[in-house]
Every structure is written in C-alpha cells, then in structure tokens.
Amino acid sequence: MKRRTTKFNYFDAFASQAELAAKEAELLMLVVENFDRAEKLQEYLPEAHRIENEADEVHHSIHDALLPDFVPPLDREDITSIASSLDEVVDLIEELILSFYMYDVRFMHTDAIEFAKILHKSCIALCGAVKEFPRARKSVPFKAGVVEVNDLEEEADRLLSLIHI
C-alpha cells in the first residue's frame, strides 16, 4: 500500500474554494453589468462552467484526502460541511448565470448590479476570512471577515426587501 508522503492541507483547499467563489461572483458582476440580452449570455456560460468544475475538483480532492486521513485537523463532519458550503456558493452563482440564459431574461433590474457587487464583496470578505481560518481563535482579521460577510448579507437583504416592495 502506497503511503502519502505529504499531508493534505485542508485550509489551503478551503482558501481555493473561496477564491473560486470570488471569481464566479466577479463573473456574475460582469454578466449583470454588461447585460443587454439573454443571447449574449452564451459567451459567459463556458467560463462560469469552467470555474464551477474547478471548484468541484477542489471539493472532491478534500473528500478524497479525508477518507484515508487518520487525524484530520478538524472533525470530519466539520470539514465536509465547510467544503460543501463553499462549493455550494460557486454552484449557486453558476446556476444564477445559467438561469438568466435558460429563462430568456430580457430585462435586468437596475438594482441587480448593486446586488451582484454586494455578492462579490461578500466573496472577497469570505476569502479573507477563510485564509485566516487556521488561526481563527486568535485572528482579528478572521473575526473581522466574518463580521464583514454578515454585514454584507444584511445589506443584500435590505436591498432585496426594497426591490420586493
């Protein structure tokens, strides 16, 4: 049986997932800012799918490493939950971009640009927090990142409530 010579770094993998979420959010921002017709979205779909596939590969690598890992740095359930949650961010953003095309969207609400910007800022803040995750207990930037993500979520909720009025 071949032994692994290097220990898998789950924290680096989480950081990669967060960076891919930020890339997908940046693409969403580009899609929304440059939207004029659904047909034009076809040019963005391959890149959205490429990013999502890359995120899936990282997600799978985490699970592949976790199975034989005798003593992972966190509880197995926590690693699985974190990896799945970060992957879900990328999946949902890709799904949103694809939905614009699939539902043949003809009009983009003016607040959609602001909403996409908030989502992108949230993913950037998530990246910062995830990079500090190994030092979470003593890290001021980690705590600040978590607060920033929560603040941006509240900002997005306020914007969404205004749109629905």
Write out the residue ranges for each language-model feature.
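Conserved small/polar residues in nucleotide/adenosyl-binding loops
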Residues: 163-165
